[in-house]
C-alpha cells in the first residue's frame, strides 16, 4: 500500500510540473516542449534509479514513487505519439520525422548521460 501511495503522490507532482511547463511555453510548435520534457525525464530517471538508492537512505517505495510516479507522469509517450501523428496527418512529414528523431536520439543520450553521471558520483563498488 505504501508503494501505491508513493506513486500517487509523486505522480501528482510530476503531472503538475509537466502541465505547468506546458502552460509557460507558447511556442508555435508546442510539441517541442513535450520533446524537452521527455529528454529531461530520461536523464532524471537514470539519476533516480542509479544514484538515489546508493546516496540517500530512502525506501524502495520512494524510489519507485519517484521513478514511476513523478517521472512517469512528467514524461509522456502517448502525447509524443499523438503529436507525431497530428504532424503527419497535417502534411508536416519532415517535421514529424525530426520530432521522432530528436525525441528518441536525445532521449537516449540523456539517459546515457544520467548513467554516466551516476557512475561518476558513486564509488565503483556501489554501481
From Swiss-Prot:
Na(+) is not transported, but it plays an essential structural role and its presence is essential for fluoride channel function. It is a multi-pass membrane protein. Coiled coil: none annotated. GO terms for biological process: cellular detoxification of fluoride. InterPro entries: FluC (IPR003691). The chain crosses the membrane at residues 4-24, 31-51, 62-82, 94-114. It catalyses: fluoride(in) = fluoride(out). It is found in: Cell membrane. Keywords: Cell membrane, Ion channel, Ion transport, Membrane, Metal-binding, Sodium, Transmembrane, Transmembrane helix, Transport. Disulfide bonds: none annotated. Its main location: membrane. Na(+) binds at residues 72, 75. It holds the Pfam family CRCB. One of its GO terms (cellular component) is plasma membrane. HAMAP family: FluC. Belongs to the fluoride channel Fluc/FEX (TC 1.A.43) family. Fluoride-specific ion channel. Important for reducing fluoride concentration in the cell, thus reducing its toxicity. This is Fluoride-specific ion channel FluC 2. It comes from Lactiplantibacillus plantarum (strain ATCC BAA-793 / NCIMB 8826 / WCFS1) (Lactobacillus plantarum). The gene is fluC2.
Amino acid at each position: 500500500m505504501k508503494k501505491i501511495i508513493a506513486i500517487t503522490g509523486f505522480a501528482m507532482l510530476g503531472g503538475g510540473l509537466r502541465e505547468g511547463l506546458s502552460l509557460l511555453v507558447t511556442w508555435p510548435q508546442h510539441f517541442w516542449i513535450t520533446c524537452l520534457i521527455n529528454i529531461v525525464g530520461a536523464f532524471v530517471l537514470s539519476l533516480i534509479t542509479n544514484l538515489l538508492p546508493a546516496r540517500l537512505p530512502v525506501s524502495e517505495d520512494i524510489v519507485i514513487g519517484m521513478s514511476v510516479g513523478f517521472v512517469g507522469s512528467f514524461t509522456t509517450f502517448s502525447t509524443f505519439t499523438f503529436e507525431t501523428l497530428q504532424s503527419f496527418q497535417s502534411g508536416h512529414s519532415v517535421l514529424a520525422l525530426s520530432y521522432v528523431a530528436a525525441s528518441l536520439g536525445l532521449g537516449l543520450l540523456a539517459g546515457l548521460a544520467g548513467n554516466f553521471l551516476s557512475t561518476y558520483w558513486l564509488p565503483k563498488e556501489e554501481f
